[in-house]
Amino acid sequence: MKIGIIGAMEPEVAHLVESMENPSSTTIAGIEFVAGQLAGKDVIVTRSGIGKVTASIATTLLIEKYAPDVIINTGSAGGFADELAIGDIVISSEVRHHDVDVTAFGYEIGQMAQQPAAFIPDAKLVAAAQKAVASLGEVKAIEGLICTGDSFICDPVRTKTMLENFPTMAACEMEGAAIAQVCHQFGVPFVVIRSLSDNANNDSPVDFDEYIVKAGHHSALMVIALLKQL
């Protein structure tokens, strides 16, 4: 099995790349792909850059050039679940865009035209992630809705609106739904795994800068533990 792993930022992929055997790096359109072995599996770790456009480009290039059997999106997110703290993990039960609105044409809020309202992760990958949780010690993990948009969320008014639109949202970030949509169109199984770097409030910019390394490391550890379950 060949596994594609995508993270947006250096702190989100650094531990994965450092842990790889026989790494070989290629850069295409400013996006870095590192192929090698991790936890006994053939992997391609991809640093996509931030946001939905670069994530879509990275995912398409990853699929076209390396043909992975599955794709895992790892990294940080803002938290919305009361039971989670910074550093805890959300495993996607579904992934949606939060900044798409074509409801005038009869679609759900967050649903892109001619696309499903929600992108559903692969059940086997989710099950493997659930089993991997036990190896993380004090880090807590839940399954939940992860929403994606091209904004860093730190405005309470915007947070309120998002929760009105997506009341079960556990986390929000800036790449997952784009990656999921590309995987959907190519027929590649996926899962999104995010560790919380902030709580999507007024303190989020400060929290993010302080905790991005911790969140990226926790998410990377979760991915490595997941690989051992495959």
UniProtKB/Swiss-Prot annotation:
GO terms of molecular function: adenosylhomocysteine nucleosidase activity; methylthioadenosine nucleosidase activity
Reaction catalyzed: S-adenosyl-L-homocysteine + H2O = S-(5-deoxy-D-ribos-5-yl)-L-homocysteine + adenine; S-methyl-5'-thioadenosine + H2O = 5-(methylsulfanyl)-D-ribose + adenine; 5'-deoxyadenosine + H2O = 5-deoxy-D-ribose + adenine
Statement: the UniProt record of this protein carries the keyword Transferase: no
GO biological process entries: L-methionine salvage from methylthioadenosine; L-methionine salvage from S-adenosylmethionine; nucleoside catabolic process
Keyword list, A-Z: Amino-acid biosynthesis, Hydrolase, Methionine biosynthesis
Stated name of the protein: 5'-methylthioadenosine/S-adenosylhomocysteine nucleosidase
Gene3D superfamilies: Nucleoside phosphorylase domain (3.40.50.1580)
Family classification: Belongs to the PNP/UDP phosphorylase family. MtnN subfamily.
Active-site residue numbers: E12, D198
